[in-house]
Curated annotation (Swiss-Prot):
It catalyses: guanosine(37) in tRNA + S-adenosyl-L-methionine = N(1)-methylguanosine(37) in tRNA + S-adenosyl-L-homocysteine + H(+). One of its GO terms (cellular component) is cytosol. This is tRNA (guanine-N(1)-)-methyltransferase. It is found in: Cytoplasm.
Amino acid sequence: MKIDILTLFPEMFAPLEHSIVGKAKEKGLLDIHYHNFRDHAEKARHVDDEPYGGGQGMLLRAQPIFDTMDSIQATKPRVILLDPAGKPFHQSYAEELALEEELIFICGHYEGYDERIKTLITDEISLGDFVLTGGELAAMTMIDATVRLIPNVLGKQASHQEDSFSSGLLEYPQYTRPYDYRGMKVPDVLMSGHHEHIRLWRMEQSLKKTYLRRPDLLETYDFSDEERRIFDKIKSELSEGEN
């Protein structure tokens, strides 16, 4: 995968050279390029200007972005504009991006964008219902979430498939050694060696955690018959506990 990032602050992306993203680069699975679009600004290196019609703040000018995009060699890239008004970023979107060969992220850093910039993009994405100073942190988050899904990036291909949200549910609780730590013991079922019992326990815990913490995820979740039976049992037990 090839990723190009348009930003005023390339140095902010130093953490991407480490951890999973750094390993992907070392394996030759990822190529990242940073483009400071101030270098392409014609007007005394100014990348922002006042909005026509008046208003608060400054807007990112179209010219530096267009010229930077012209300098990037790409065939059919997915061009992502980071914007609080964009569609929310989800795990399913990261899975979609992981299938692409070329991605371009445009990071703003002012009150907004000249609307003409949006003629360059394919996706307008938001990290959530809040506003950041710039798009860099959002881009780094999305890149990390995407790159780890590229085949052969993680040590075990199945390791990301049981992450929270990958299945549509939150992940079940997990434990490691020691068995007993300060009186807190690992659930006996995980020590039993009975794979079917462990599978059912994990399914129940995952459904229960999702129901208690993110019930909105269950509104569109496609339950199997087995999951539906377990989920009904969970709701019944929780209801009895409240009475």
